Amino acid sequence: MGKIGIFGGTFDPPHYGHLLMANEVLDALQLSEIWFLPNRLPPHKQHEQVTKSEDRLRMLELAVAGHPRFHIETIELEREGPSYTYDTIRQLVAMHPNDEFYFIIGADMVEYLPHWHRIDELIELVTFVGVKRPGFSMETPYPVIEVEAPQFAVSSSLIRERVRNGQTIRYLVPEGVRLYIEEKGLYGARTGVTDRETTADRAALRAYAWRCRDRC
């Protein structure tokens, strides 16, 4: 019997924060594998513009390449309509009846569990794992395993914004992902811009160093 961690998301784009979070849960719970689950159409983002599935999948492949226990499950990309976790987990359980599934969520999602589609049935199929973050409560009426992880203040929206502004994203995403974004012109990228240290980057680094001078 395998212990499988499921990490769902749009991964638009995937970044080192995703990988760090997945690896911490893998180690803390001694899981067999982590399956990254790219969404086709997340219910909470139905009105947002999301990068094409094939681009997000390719970036995710580049991000997890080389980690022997990181894999990608494309079940939601292959299914039409909103990507409800209940439908996905029910299908995975049917396909892999001898495995145990652990669904990984950030602390910011824990308080929303009561609003998840068919949550009372879902908790009978999967164990939720919440990764702690400062400023977010882990209180919920549903069972959640809490996992500590180092804080890495990066988000997909931040990366998209930096690319649009012509700022570097080196060391925020795996190198293969950075090059793919540049090659495909995703998020408004222009060739060569994502790799150049700009005046804005240097100013941001100086500001960060100043804020952290007494506590970092």
UniProtKB/Swiss-Prot annotation:
It comes from the Bacteria. Pathway: Cofactor biosynthesis; NAD(+) biosynthesis; deamido-NAD(+) from nicotinate D-ribonucleotide: step 1/1. InterPro entries: Cyt_trans-like (IPR004821), NadD/NMNAT (IPR005248), Rossmann-like_a/b/a_fold (IPR014729). It holds the Pfam family CTP_transf_like. It is an enzyme of class 2 (transferase). GO terms for biological process: NAD biosynthetic process. Keywords: ATP-binding, NAD, Nucleotide-binding, Nucleotidyltransferase, Pyridine nucleotide biosynthesis, Transferase. It catalyses: nicotinate beta-D-ribonucleotide + ATP + H(+) = deamido-NAD(+) + diphosphate. GO terms for molecular function: ATP binding; nicotinate-nucleotide adenylyltransferase activity. Its EC number is 2.7.7.18. Catalyzes the reversible adenylation of nicotinate mononucleotide (NaMN) to nicotinic acid adenine dinucleotide (NaAD). Belongs to the NadD family. This is Probable nicotinate-nucleotide adenylyltransferase. It comes from Geobacillus kaustophilus (strain HTA426).
